[in-house]
Curated annotation (Swiss-Prot):
S-S bonds: none
Family: Belongs to the UPF0754 family.
Record field: transmembrane: 4-24, 358-378
Protein name as it appears in the record: UPF0754 membrane protein SH1116
Sorted UniProt keywords: Cell membrane, Membrane, Transmembrane, Transmembrane helix
Top-level lineage group: Bacteria
Membrane topology: Multi-pass membrane protein
Keyword Membrane: yes
Species of origin: Staphylococcus haemolyticus (strain JCSC1435)
Gene Ontology CC entries for this record: plasma membrane
Compartment(s) where it occurs, according to its Swiss-Prot or TrEMBL record: Cell membrane
InterPro entries for this protein: DUF445 (IPR007383), UCP032178 (IPR016991)
């Protein structure tokens, strides 16, 4: 009986120790939230693991999401899936179906989008000839006038103000290009071509420096050159001189008469093509062309859907760069309260954490059992 009590006691003690140890270990993942000090010395294991490593965790989660979960290829694949295409197409059709409303007319659409045009006057007075004549007369009157005198003063002022930023923008873009991997490769390729053309003379230089080191040196000096004050002065002066030269040129030198005529005719033709007769301006579209809406929904809707997907795919890389998904995830996680993070992890891994605690009790009890047996025989 005594031996049984000893074993039972050791099992209970071992189970309590094992279980409590695992409970404390799990608690130490989250707590304490801040470090504690005794005599200016930080107490070990404060703060807890997750509070201490929260920024690293946020960085890694953001990296995993950007590089493995929500990647450009994944989004491209999703965009081109039949379900996505169908959803976009349904939305486009839904918007186009509004044309079926009884009061939807061309004039109302024009007014809705603030087209400040007297459609009746334009149609009745032969818009094409009127506009072409006015444009041609304007060109003949202004062909000897400089661009500086033709453009409005506020436009000239705006361009003058923005012009000072052009040099800085050019130098910045040049710096970005030279600092990029492509810039480095291009410099190396040009040096490689240069060495191949110069032959043995340049070969002597390679006895002291490798092509890679020469390319790095050239890259460094070019980048440094873009930051040199004199480079800024030269670039700004060239831009300013070219701009002043352009402003002083007469209109006929900048745009030739034949070019102006072609542009005018194309523009007027485009305007006329998109206008209708007066009686059709106030006729509901559903009555004007009963089959038009259905044709639009079938043909144009598919075209618009393809265009949306194509444009989204072509600009996806730029969009992803602008969004900066990794940084967005990091910032969001870092704004979470530690209490919320603790609740979130516990909700996700509640079952597993309970199993870990139970395993601690079980292993502790097993160890206590064997310790009890050893204690009896010893």
């Amino acid at each position: 009986m005594q031996a049984f009590l000893v074993i039972l006691f050791m099992v209970v003690v071992g189970a309590v120790i094992g279980g409590v140890t695992n409970v404390i270990a799990i608690r130490m993942l989250f707590h304490p939230f801040k470090p504690y000090y005794i005599f200016k010395m930080r107490i070990p294991f404060t703060p807890g693991l997750i509070p201490k490593r929260r920024e690293e965790i946020a960085t890694k989660i953001g990296q995993v999401i950007e590089e493995h979960l929500i990647t450009e290829s994944v989004i491209l694949q999703k965009l081109n899936e039949p379900n996505t295409r169908e959803a976009i197409n349904d939305l486009v059709i839904k918007q186009l179906s509004k044309l079926k409303s009884d009061d939807a007319t061309i004039r109302k659409f024009a007014n809705q989008f603030d087209f400040d045009l007297d459609l009746d006057d334009l149609i009745n007075n032969k818009l094409d000839k009127t506009i072409i004549n006015k444009l041609n007369n304007y060109y003949y009157d202004k062909q000897a006038t400089s661009i500086n005198e033709i453009l409005p003063a506020d436009v000239i002022t705006m361009v003058d103000e923005k012009l000072d930023q052009a040099g800085d923008l050019i130098r910045e873009r040049a710096r970005n290009y030279l600092s990029s991997d492509k810039g480095a490769r291009d410099i190396y390729d040009m040096l490689d071509t240069f060495f191949a053309e110069k032959g043995k003379i340049v070969g002597l230089l390679q006895m002291f420096m490798t092509k890679e080191s020469i390319a790095e040196r050239v890259q460094h000096e070019l980048i440094r050159l873009t930051r040199h004050p004199k480079a800024k002065v030269i670039i700004d002066k060239v831009i300013r001189d070219e701009y002043e030269t352009l402003k002083s040129q007469p209109l006929s030198h900048v745009v030739k008469e034949e070019q102006f005529t072609n542009i005018s005719e194309s523009l007027v033709h485009l305007v006329i093509t998109n206008l209708q007769l007066n009686e059709k301006m106030d006729t509901p579209i559903s009555k004007l062309t009963p089959k038009l809406v259905d044709q639009i929904q079938v043909g144009v809707a598919n075209t618009i859907t393809d265009l949306i997907i194509k444009q989204a795919s072509n600009h996806l890389s730029t969009i992803m760069t602008k969004i900066n998904l990794r940084q967005m995830v990091e910032n969001q996680i870092n704004t979470f309260d530690l209490d919320y993070i603790e609740r979130l992890i516990i909700e996700i891994a509640n079952k597993e954490l309970k199993l870990i605690m139970s395993l601690g009790f079980i292993l502790g009890g097993i160890i206590g059992f064997f310790q009890g047996i050893v204690a009896i025989f010893v």
